[in-house]
Amino acid sequence: MAKPKKKEGFLETIKTIIFALILAGIFRTLFFQPFWIPSGSMKDTLLIGDFLFVNKMSYGYSYASCPTVRIAAIGLNIEAEDICGFLRGGNKRILGAEPKRGDVVVFRHPSNGQDYIKRLIALPGEKVQIKNGLVFINGTPVEVISDGTFDEVKAPQGPFRNMPRCANEVVEQNGICKKEKFVETLPNGVSHSILNFMRQTVDD
């Protein structure tokens, strides 16, 4: 007599888990999504291994915001087209808001599909150039002021065990890795830290 109850209890548990996963997926897609930092391109604002939640409501929702939902176990297969097809074409957004200079944003690369976490320094229609390592927006150089150095231990960082790049002379394992630190101020007055990794081809 107890077996049917156990079976019913098991099925209820499975239903609860599936329902919780669906709710978590909706919450992750529409409201907040967790990210961790895999590289040092945003030092010293964001460090390798840092964990953050991204507010997906900041700039509203577009066609690209909608998910494709597939749960093979229950035969659920909902395409993004079925959910947000009415938003296709142009730059249609719901509850849209314009991004601002200095915002740290997450976007999906259109070619490889990877998520990138970067800082927004220019707005649509503006011309951005890099000359001798300096950023120019519409032909005007962005203000840069020296702010000492950023020091860290030369040791594997994060899940990928990346080694930090050093601007000082050859640094042994567990030595102090130094990079020049600057404060960059954008045209709207927003400031942030940047690091100099030595001169390289992308400086021009």
Q: Where are the model-predicted features located?
A:
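Hydrophobic membrane-insertion alpha-helices, especially the h-region
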Residues: E12-L30
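Soluble "head" domains of membrane/secretory-pathway proteins
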Residues: A2-I14, F35, D44, I48-D204
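Aromatic-capped interface at the extracytoplasmic side
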Residues: I26-G40
